[in-house]
Amino acid sequence: MEDSSDSFSKLNTDVSRETLLLFHKYRDLIINEKQSLISKNDQKHIWIRHFHDSLRLSNFIELSDLNIIDIGSGAGLPGIPLALVSNKKNHYYLCENRRKRADFLNEVI
């Protein structure tokens, strides 16, 4: 199992203890979800394959006062991880047309 703090240090991203707790809660929701939002194998590597990869996008966008749309959001990736580290400087919109996944996203947010 991966270490969450190691994942953030590889990105040179400092996150508060509160933000790290939110990532852990989000991870638990994804892993415990019955509809298999990510594969069983990916669950072991969620910090790198999903959270770390999502946050790499922050290197390419200015994270301040933006409206960001995550189309086909599925499990909320990359929208939710980006929202967690942007410190409410942006507005995020998660778009998902599959009802069960949209219900999951509503539960998360």
Task: Please report, for each region that a protein language model flagged, where it lies by residue.
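Class I SAM-dependent transferase core
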Residues: 2-63, 69, 107
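Conserved SAM/SAH cofactor-binding pocket of Class I
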Residues: 55-109
